[in-house]
A protein has these predicted regions:
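Alpha-helical interface subdomain recognition
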Residues: 2-58, 64-74, 249-286
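Glycine-rich flavin
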Residues: 42, 46-50, 55-157, 161
Length: 286
């Protein structure tokens, strides 16, 4: 697993929140166009790489900053005020990074991935839902097929957000072909490990820049890429709580920005009406 070292922005003398604000400024510039065209926010995500936001949770010993959930939620809130799509992409990515950090220690392959993620600021997507399972992420149809020191996986993913733009995918799967649907594992896949065949288009309302679509995911790699800890523990301890904290921070940021826009609109209308507020507008200008 080769590592490409990213240039350090100001030797990381700025805080995570200060860097997030700079990324938010880039994201805000393209936010309307991104949502209108359902296009990936390339400039904003590149800015997140440059300002080293994608690897903030990686422990210091693996080249990261040892960022906390508080850092992630502040980051997501800040980005949410600027561009909903950028913020949600970062939130989903950070949820997967949290799983890697908390459940990948002690596994040589996953520790090497942490080092690479910190160095290259890789972007990770996730594959958690399937055609047969709908939105139930605690039930998998596709199974990991082990072959000596390797594995293969064929998965009908109902939706993968920014799957074609990501550097890797974290996927859920059944532990084996004869395992129960709820006996699941988490697998870290690099771009060279898989192919994606688009099977379903999503015409989403909002957050269109997440580029969410259905795919047939065909993957193969080393058995070391499968997390040793069972997914039920990862789901309960990390995946669900971090996802909900990150997503809700994004939504809070979106809501705060919407209120600000409403306030500006009402104040402009009031100035044009000699200071008279529109009906029902007083609570927006408190």
């Amino acid at each position: 697993m080769s590592i490409i070292q990213m240039q350090q922005p100001d030797a990381l003398t700025e805080t995570i929140l200060e860097r997030a604000a700079k990324v938010a400024a880039v994201a805000a510039t393209d936010a309307e166009a991104v949502d209108r065209a359902a296009s990936f926010p390339k400039a904003a995500i590149e800015a997140a790489r440059i300002h080293q936001l994608l690897g903030v949770q990686i422990p210091l010993e693996f080249g990261g900053e040892g960022g906390t959930s508080f850092d992630v939620t502040d980051m997501c809130y800040t980005l949410g005020r600027a561009c909903a799509s950028t913020a949600m992409i970062v939130a989903m990515h950070q949820t997967k990074v949290a799983c890697l950090v908390r459940h990948g220690r002690g596994n040589g392959w996953h520790e090497a991935l942490m080092r690479r993620l910190a160095a290259e600021q890789m972007l990770f997507a996730s594959s958690t839902t399937e055609g047969q399972g709908g939105g139930n992420v605690r039930s998998s149809a596709a199974a990991v097929e082990r072959n000596g020191t390797g594995f293969s996986l064929l998965r009908d993913a109902t939706v993968i957000s920014y799957g074609e733009q990501a550097d890797g995918i974290i996927s859920i799967a059944r532990r084996a072909a004869d395992a129960a649907a709820s006996d699941q594992v988490l697998v870290a896949l690099l771009k060279e490990n898989y192919t994606l065949e688009r099977t379903l288009e999503w015409e989403t309302l909002g957050m269109r820049g997440t580029c969410s679509a259905g795919f047939k995911l065909k993957a193969a790699g080393s058995a070391e890429q499968v997390f040793p800890e069972s997914y039920d523990k990862i789901h309960a301890q990390t995946m669900t709580p971090v996802a909900h904290l990150s997503w809700s921070s994004v939504w809070a940021g979106i809501a705060a920005a919407a209120v600000e826009r409403a306030q500006m609109f009402i104040r402009k209308a009031a100035r044009g009406a000699g200071g008279q507020l529109p009906p029902g507008a007083a609570h927006f200008t408190a």
